[in-house]
Regions:
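Membrane-interface interhelical linkers
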Residues: 1-11, 19-30, 35-67, 76-86, ...
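Specific alpha-helical transmembrane segments that line the substrate/conduction pathway
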Residues: 9, 67-73, 80-128, 177-178, ...
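Hydrophobic/small/kink-forming positions within alpha-helical transmembrane segments
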Residues: 10, 14, 18, 45, ...
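Internal alpha-helical transmembrane segments of multi-pass membrane proteins, especially GPCRs
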Residues: 34, 93, 178, 210-211, ...
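Flexible, substrate/cofactor-facing loop regions flanked by secondary structure
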Residues: 151-156, 163-177, 181-191, 196-200
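C-terminal functional regions that serve as terminal interaction/effector modules
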Residues: 237-240, 246, 254, 263, ...
Length: 303
């Protein structure tokens, strides 16, 4: 069952990232962020009964959760921007490497580093270097969005570390997610209200755009549900490892529908990044800290 939940989460997050990219390239990253987060927020209010948890009412933990929410907002904003302007096959695996940043945070805060985690961190850096120093075939690939993708990985990595260490225990899974999505929706609404709207030259009907936003939000929610249920039934290690590879789905879709073409060196760099993510997500020893892994909702989506 762990394989089922892990693959389900990876598939939904991967499809969701592609839907986010499609919407962002029509209406911009800010508006796509607003629409998707609002729809996702509504879905989590509906799902509260599925994940009951006695919530700590102390203000201190909520302030810490709000700090995590700030990193979440930055992570979402930079993810959506990277998807809007960048080559999806580049920026998706880089943005999805936040689990490596979370592992690095545990190392920095004096927890005993795991060999696999350290290897994953090294592979991530090497993969990014290979990608950014290579040239795409036919000039189709661009390095635009790579800085935003790196910023996304750092922001989500710190966010998940804060959630793992300070928030998930007293608040559970759903309450923090609702707070994070509420903060993201508020930020996006404020930004959209003050920014100038420049739609794409060719726009689909408004109903189609709403449909894309709904699908993206639904996929993000389904991915989270699959991940959380799998983790609840003690399949955490398997679910985490498989879910961490959601970027593979996005890369395949980018090649098929966006016709992105990468050079061999660039494919090698992407592969090294994905391998680093997998190494960090593999089962650890019992005394090692467990880092949270999810999507650019993630989580991403939720990203």
């Amino acid at each position: 069952m762990g394989i089922f939940y892990g693959l389900g989460a990876a598939l939904c997050w991967g499809l969701g990232d592609f839907a986010i990219t499609t919407l962002a390239r029509y209406v911009g990253s800010a508006r796509s962020l607003l629409y998707i987060q609002v729809f996702s927020l509504v879905s989590w209010f509906v799902l509260i009964p599925l994940f009951p948890h006695e919530v700590d009412t102390g203000l201190s933990v909520w302030w810490i959760a709000a700090l995590a929410g700030t990193f979440h907002v930055v992570g979402l904003a930079t993810t959506y921007r990277a998807f809007e302007i960048g080559t999806l096959s580049f920026v998706s695996p880089i943005a999805s490497s936040f689990a490596i940043v979370t592992a690095l945070m545990f190392v920095v805060t004096n927890n005993s580093p795991e060999t696999l985690s350290l290897a994953g961190i090294v592979l991530l850096v090497c993969g990014i270097v290979v990608v950014t120093r290579s040239t795409g075939s036919g000039g189709q690939a661009t390095l635009k969005g790579v800085p935003e993708a790196i910023a996304s990985a750092v922001s989500f990595g710190v966010m998940f570390w804060i959630m793992d260490v300070y928030v998930s225990g007293p608040l559970g899974d759903v309450a923090p997610l609702i707070l994070l999505k509420l903060m993201a929706s508020t930020f996006a609404a404020a930004y959209v209200a003050k920014s100038k709207y420049e739609p794409a030259p060719v726009m689909p009907p408004k109903g189609t755009l709403i449909g894309i936003a709904l699908v993206a939000a639904l996929l993000d929610t389904m991915a989270w549900v699959s991940y959380l249920i799998g983790y609840r039934f003690d399949h955490g290690a398997v679910v985490t490892a498989l879910a961490s590879l959601f970027s593979v789905v996005t890369i395949v879709l980018a090649g098929v529908f966006l016709k992105e073409r990468l050079s061999r060196n660039q494919w090698a760099g992407v592969g090294v990044v994905l391998l680093g993510i997998l190494l960090v997500s593999l089962p650890k020893s019992e005394n090692a800290p467990v880092s949270a892994v999810a999507g650019p909702d993630v989580l991403a989506e939720s990203k």
